[in-house]
Amino acid sequence: METMSYENRIALGNLVPTLGQFKVMDKIPQYQQCEVHNLVEAPAEVPEVLRHVVFNIERGQTLHETIDFLNMCPELKNMDIIYANELDDGAVRSGNCNVAYEIAKSIGMNYAYGLEFIELVNPDDNKGFHGNALFSRWPIRWAKVVHMPEQYNWYYDRQKRIGARVAIVCSLDIGGREVGAVSVHLENRADSEGREAQMAVVYDEIRRSFAPDTPVMIGGDLNTNTFDGNDIPGFTALFNDPERLAKHMAAVEKYERVLPQAEENGFSYREFSSIEGTRRKPMPGGKSMLLKLDWLMARGMECVDHGTISTETKDCTWAEPGSALAKFTGPELSDHNACWADCRFAK
């Protein structure tokens, strides 16, 4: 995507208090774009089972180590599609590079990328872009960005931003068969009803874009906290009550409408996603709260197997000697674990 000067970014940001996020976004062409880059040839044959992976990259701040993780992890050797969240393009914190392109090039995949936020805090950011991506071994026929209803205005946050949450809706060509693939990132600073409203827009777009019998997989960080992310006293109290927290994590669907909503729209999630926690939310005192935020949900597919892969450095024992990952001394590559599901088309 074409860059914008920092001065232009700030000038547009200054319009948000008067115009609101969406009217400012309408003035920015990059928000209407979805980058699609088919970099590799399609595999010669379609396997019976395809591996789908959800991974919140956490901006790409450990880019080289993350690329090693994707290339070296035994459970990711034969992955077909990655539903990826939080990828920078031109931000100092991730090396001022295009994270999606660097990953796609290094792991041998095609990709689609859509802009979610323009960061306004750091004048040294080349672009300050931040968004979602979908990586695929299979050709991407087309892709579009879906802007979801605002549930939190990030302009007034310490992470001062222009933008709103997005989904990337893609049509893949898997051996001549159309398959829908949707990378989603829902709002954490919202309650269950807010996330449900965001997903309603995604389902509307799926109905417009695909025939009813087209297989579709949705994957991403749905931020199913089981609480309102703005309620700091509320989730702190939950953290301090391990028994109640365990009940929340064991029955996320009771607290998060997006899960029963999936079934109401013809998508299954129970057999495609592990019940293990996927995100380590930092808490006071150097502690963390383990939450189940990352999901795969599908229609027209059957799950053969699924699992979760730790992104904590201590668990990457398979890292090749001398690699960036093997040399990495940080505690984790991302604050999210990666999740996968092996799926075949329903008969």
Predicted regions and their residues:
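Acidic/histidine-rich helix-loop elements
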Residues: 8, 43, 49-68, 88-92, ...
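Short, solvent-exposed aromatic-acidic interface loops
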Residues: 147-154, 187, 309-319
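Short catalytic/ligand-binding loop motif for oxyanion handling, primarily in non-cytosolic enzymes
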Residues: 61-63, 90-93, 120-124, 128-131, ...
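Structured beta-strand-rich core segments of catalytic domains in phosphoester-bond hydrolases
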Residues: 2-44, 87-178
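Catalytic metal-binding/acid-base residues of hydrolase active sites
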Residues: 58, 88, 117-118, 185-187, ...
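Metal-dependent phosphoester-hydrolase catalytic domains
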Residues: 1-38, 207-217, 224-347
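Stable alpha-helical elements in mature extracytoplasmic
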Residues: 62, 66, 99, 103, ...
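Active-site beta-strand/loop signature of hydrolases that rely on acidic residues for catalysis
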Residues: 50-57, 70-96, 135, 170, ...
